[in-house]
C-alpha cells in the first residue's frame, strides 16, 4: 500500500526557516517524481515544487522560487522541503503528492502539515454564543452557533455537548484575520421544540494556549424593552465562495475550438440555493452565458457553474471579463475579474532532446521537449508519431525564468523498440506569439546511432 507520511511544520516567525519531510513506503521511491502542494486558509490548492525522480530537474512556483529548496534522499525514501525567509503568506497546510502511474493527477497524498508564519504570540480564543430570538424559531428547526474569535495559532477544536451531539453540526474553516489572529464558527441545527428543554453547550479546546471553554447557547427573549445583540458578520459564519477560471490555452489558439471563461460558486446552502450571475466584458454587461444546473456536494452544499463563451481575439487582445455573483447568503455581491496576462508576447523556442545513452539500457526511454523564452505562460504542448497522438507524456507547469519569460519541459515515454525502429516523434507547441499560433519539432534515431 502506497503511503506518504509527513513530519515537520509548526509555528515560526517571519524570516525564519523550517524543513518538512515526506517519508514514502509501498513503492520504489527512486522511480517516482513527487511534488509539494499547499493550501492557504480559505484558498484553493497551490502547486509549490517538484523534483524529478533522478534529481536532475527541480521546478518551483514563482511565489517560493529562491526561498524554498526541494531535495530527496533515496536511501531513506524521503522527500524534503527546506523553506527559508518565510513570509506570513506562506502560512498553509503543505502536502506531498505522487502522480498516478498512468494519469496526470495526484493519486497519493501525505496527511498534510500545517505551517504557520506569524509574529503573533500564543493567544487563547474568546467564545461567543450565537442564538436566534425566541420569536424566530417557529419553522421547525433552529440554528445555534458558536463564534470562536481571536486565537493563535491553529488549530482549535469545537464539539457540542462534549461530543454527544454530532448530527446537524457544521464547523466552518478558520479565517485568518488582518490582525494575524484566527476566527471560526460552528453551527448546529436542532428542533425548535427542544429549545428550553434541552441544553446545548459549545465546547472549545485550544491546546496551544491550554484554553478550554464551555459556552451554553440558548435563544434570547426579545421584546420592546430588550434589544437583541447584533448578528455577527456573515463572513465569519461562512458562505459561498467564487472562483473564476480562464479558458484553456489550446481553446484560445485554435479557431476550431471554443474558449470559455468559467465562474464557479461553491458552498451554496440549501436555505439560499438561488445564485444569480452577471457577466461583463470590459465593463459592458453581456447575456450569452450559460448557467449549468446546480450540483449537490458531499458536504451538503451546492456547486453552481456559469460559463461564458468568449471570442478568440477578444481574449488574446486582453479584454477583461468580470463575473458578478449574487446570493441571499452574501452581504453584498462578489465580483471576480480575469484577463490574459499583460505584456509583450514572446515567441517560444523549441528544442527536442533524444534519450541519453545510459537510458538505452532500459525497456522504455524518454524523449524530451524543451520550450523556453515564451510569454505569457499560456501554452499547450502535445506529442504525436506518424500523425497519431501520443498520450504517455507529462509536461511541467511553466516556470518563470530570470529574464521574465517562461520555460517548461515535456517528457514522452516510449518503448525502446519503437525508438530503435526509427519512428519519428514530434513535439507540437501552441502559443499566441508563434506564426499561426503553432510550431512542431521532430526527432528520431539517426542511422548508425
Curated annotation (Swiss-Prot):
Main location: secreted
Cellular location(s): Secreted; Cell membrane
Cystine connections: 22-96, 146-202, 263-323, 369-427
CC per GO annotation: extracellular region; immunoglobulin complex; plasma membrane
Glycosylated residues (UniProt): 73, 299
CDD domains recorded: IgC1_CH1_IgEG, IgC1_CH3_IgAEM_CH2_IgG, IgC1_CH3_IgAGD_CH4_IgAEM, IgV_H
Keywords attached to this entry: Adaptive immunity, Cell membrane, Disulfide bond, Glycoprotein, Immunity, Immunoglobulin, Immunoglobulin domain, Membrane, Pyrrolidone carboxylic acid, Repeat, Secreted
GO BP annotations listed: adaptive immune response
Residues covered by region (Constant (C) domain): 120-449
Positions of post-translational Pyrrolidone carboxylic acid modification: 1
Effect in UniProt of substituting residue 255 to A: Impaired ability to activate the classical complement pathway
Annotated stretches, region: Variable (V) domain, involved in antigen recognition: 1-119
Mutagenesis / variant outcome for changing residue 302 to R: Impaired ability to activate the classical complement pathway
Domain Ig-like: 1-96, 125-218, 240-339, 348-444
Function: Immunoglobulins, also known as antibodies, are membrane-bound or secreted glycoproteins produced by B lymphocytes. In the recognition phase of humoral immunity, the membrane-bound immunoglobulins serve as receptors which, upon binding of a specific antigen, trigger the clonal expansion and differentiation of B lymphocytes into immunoglobulins-secreting plasma cells. Secreted immunoglobulins mediate the effector phase of humoral immunity, which results in the elimination of bound antigens.
Subunit structure: Immunoglobulins are composed of two identical heavy chains and two identical light chains; disulfide-linked.
Protein name per its UniProtKB record: Immunoglobulin gamma-1 heavy chain
Record organism: Homo sapiens (Human)
Lineage summary: Eukaryota, Metazoa, Chordata, Craniata, Vertebrata
